[in-house]
From Swiss-Prot:
Record family assignment: Belongs to the insulin family.
Keywords of the record: Carbohydrate metabolism, Cleavage on pair of basic residues, Disulfide bond, Glucose metabolism, Hormone, Secreted, Signal
Described function: Insulin decreases blood glucose concentration. It increases cell permeability to monosaccharides, amino acids and fatty acids. It accelerates glycolysis, the pentose phosphate cycle, and glycogen synthesis in liver.
PANTHER family, sorted: INSULIN, INSULIN/INSULIN GROWTH FACTOR
Disulfide bond sites: C30-C96, C42-C109, C95-C100
Any single Gene Ontology cellular-component annotation: extracellular space
UniProt-recorded name of the protein: Insulin
Subunit and partners: Heterodimer of a B chain and an A chain linked by two disulfide bonds.
Organism: Pantodon buchholzi
Chief localisation class: secreted
Length: 110
C-alpha cells in the first residue's frame, strides 16, 4: 500500500511538472503530503527533516543570565510590538501556506 502511494505521488508530481501543465504545476503540500513529495523529489540525496521531539533544556540553562522572576527580557526590548512582523521562509510557509512546484521542493534536498 505504501509503495502504491509513493508511486502515485511521483506520478502526480511528474504530471504536474510536465511542460503542458504549467498552470497546474504549483500546489499546496502540507503535512505528510509534503514529506512524501520531498521523498519523491529528493530520492537518495535525502532532505533536511527532523521530526519534533522533546529536548532536554537543562544543558541550555547555563547560557541564560540569572534574572529575578519579576524581570522580563521582553520588557527591555524597545520594539517588542514589531516582533510579529517577522517573515517566515521555511518549506511549510513556501509549500503549505502558498502553492509551490517541483523546483521549489528541489531547493530543500541535501
Amino acid at each position: 500500500m505504501a509503495l502504491w502511494l509513493q508511486a502515485f505521488t511521483l506520478l502526480v508530481l511528474l504530471v504536474l511538472s510536465s511542460p503542458g501543465a504549467q498552470s497546474a504545476s504549483s500546489q499546496h503540500l502540507c503535512g505528510s503530503h509534503l514529506v512524501d513529495a520531498l521523498y519523491m523529489v529528493c530520492g537518495e540525496k535525502g532532505f533536511f527533516y527532523q521530526p519534533k521531539t522533546k529536548r532536554d533544556v537543562d544543558p541550555l540553562l547555563g547560557f541564560l543570565s540569572p534574572k529575578s522572576a519579576q524581570e522580563n527580557e521582553a520588557d527591555e526590548y524597545p520594539y517588542k510590538d514589531q516582533g510579529d512582523l517577522k517573515v517566515k521562509r521555511g518549506i511549510v510557509e513556501q509549500c503549505c501556506h502558498h502553492p509551490c512546484n517541483i523546483f521549489d521542493l528541489q531547493n530543500y534536498c541535501n
